[in-house]
Amino acid sequence: PASCTSIGDYAFDGCQALTAFSVAEGNSAYCAEDGVLFSADQSMLIRYPQAREETGYAVPDACRTLGDWSFIGASTLEQIDLNQVTAIGEDCFYYCTALKNIAVPDGVTQLNGAVFAYCTSLEQVTLPDTMQTLGDYCFYSDVALADINIPDGVTQLGEKCFYNCGALLELSLPASITEIGEKALGYYTNADGKDDQRIDKLNIRNEGSAAVRAYERSWKHASLWKWLLAGGIAVVVAGGITVIVLVHRSRNRIRTTTRQASATKPGKRK
């Protein structure tokens, strides 16, 4: 109605049959363009109808901001042209399961929240040179994602940013990165529903970041420590002394037994 001047968070959450918005003439706060809800001046896209059947959409040139949850659940969209957008809200494309590729425009500096989470058909993402932050759960469970550039200037990868991205087998990370969140990349949930499994085939190319180096070191040893905690044997060689560590688990407690297997002087073979 013309009298509506405020729409609260989650106002259209779960409206899975909604195909179009209409705004009464004379409304000073909102307008509808081709069935999509905008602020009155079209500078912000507020909500794309979840049940709209089109496979492609171009954001109007006047629009600069995509609001939080604005495309959530738009399951038929395969292509989206973001045009002049400079800000993208949290969970913006959450569960856009048909989306195949996306080019984020110049001017966008951060992707906070689960912006592209569960975009299960998303294969390629192009990020601009202005990008600085990829937030928590940004590309969570984008199982088809195989190609993404991380530009120099990005400083942060949030917690589980690329979690469960099993098709992403090679990733170059710039020297500008100073912070990487827990399990940001290299982990997935397997077919049996077991979380935090390591993606062994992932090749991380570090372009000089100390944070990446530390994360990669931790990630590479993750499977060994998980195996040890489950109960196993570690063989450690240091200073010519071979030590066997037996790890036992009983009633959620861990007990270790250390045995010296051999002592060999450096440079001398048995």
Give names to the regions the model predicted.
Residues P1-S6, C15-G35, A40-T65, A74-A87, ...:
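Structural signature of tandem-repeat unit edges
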Residues K100, N112, N149, K160, ...:
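Intrinsically disordered, low-complexity polyampholyte segments enriched for Lys and acidic residues
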Residues A214-L228:
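Short, aromatic-rich amphipathic segments at membrane interfaces
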Residues W227-L246:
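Selective detector of the "anchor" transmembrane alpha-helix that sits immediately C-terminal
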